Amino acid sequence: MQVIRLAVTPPKDPMLPPDPTMIRDAEILSQLTDTIARFVRERLVPAEQHVAETDTIPDDIVADMKAMGLFGLSIPEQYGGLGLTMEEEVLVAFELGRTSPAFRSLMGTNNGIGAQGILIDGTEEQKQKYVPALATGEVIGAFCLTEPDVGSDSGAVKTRAQRDGDHYILNGTKRYITNGPHAGLFTVMARTDPEIQGGGGVTAFIVEGDTPGISRGKADVKMGQKGAHTCDIIFDNCRVPAENIIGGKEGVGFKTAMKVLDRGRLHISAICVGVATRLIEDAVNFAAERKQFGKPIIEHQLIQAMLADSRAEMFAGRSMVLEAARSKDRGEKVSLDASCCKLFCSEMVGRVADRAVQIHGGAG
């Protein structure tokens, strides 16, 4: 399946018309979203059971994802990506969300948290050196913020980075690192100034995956999302060149991380909307075929009410995400709105999934 490598813009969304100021070429983005929707339908959905059973995405599918440019959706064209705006990215994510999250997880870090720190705050030299390989999928990126004792209190990073000449020596453990087992490039948040409490003493580093002193823990065993891998990343006297500080400046890594997470929250919110859309479609199709009491169960009012509630919540989430994405594209601060989107959409898709299971009854 061939990638469409042109400047792209949103088509007329069937549920909420896009902001005209964000449109660059609606026809080309329509081609891109149609191509991805077909790829999801014809290649990814049929492979879902295999991925769930083997915890592995087939190599031929990964190759197709690379050929289509999916690893560089949000990476600017000058670094080999498609250069989608935030609104365009969430429109694509709506389609990618209609299949197992494992597929999106593999390439999601390259588009998001694995590359955005470099793109947002990195030097031009850093961008030229590292981003093109992320855009093609040649290298998988990962984002190292969470630690065994550092979760929601993300400014309390304990991993240390001590200056040693023209290098820094990193020591510490990062936990639940998405794509950690496969990553060839890490964005690492480490404390360079232990005297400063909170995020002010944290610096962002670019660390290559084959750097001596890096080891990877055993892949986490999860109840769901088979095929999407996480693990601990351990730094033991890992020497990183000082030139690999993102942007060349100490003490601003926490700010970089927060900027990265704004985009990531909107992307994940859009994926939740896509998952909810798939759940509703599957529930409608099942309810139309399943008969009880002499008629399809979709004709029973209780089933209709559950579908209506799910559809209304999905629409609300979709509208929220698109509005926040447009605000980000206009250069507005969206930290609060992006967090609201992720909170609502992640809880919304849980409720939709619960109703879908109920509609399927014993088959759920």
Please give the residue ranges for each predicted region.
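Alpha-helical interface subdomain recognition
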Residues: M1-T109, D121-Q126, A133-E138, D153, ...
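Short glycine/proline-enriched turns and hinge-like loops at secondary-structure junctions
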Residues: L84-T85, D153-G155, N179-G184, G198-G201, ...
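Flexible, glycine-rich active-site loops centered on histidine and acidic residues
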Residues: A115-D121, F143
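A short, Trp-centered hydrophobic/proline-enriched beta-strand micro-motif
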Residues: G137-L145, M189
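Glycine-rich phosphate/pyrophosphate-binding beta-alpha loops
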Residues: V150, R175-P181, R263-H267
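Flexible, small-/acidic-enriched active-site or ligand-binding loops
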Residues: A156, P212-R239
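A structural signal for short hydrophobic beta-strand segments in well-ordered beta-sheet cores
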Residues: T159-A161
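A short core secondary-structure module
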Residues: H167, N171-R216
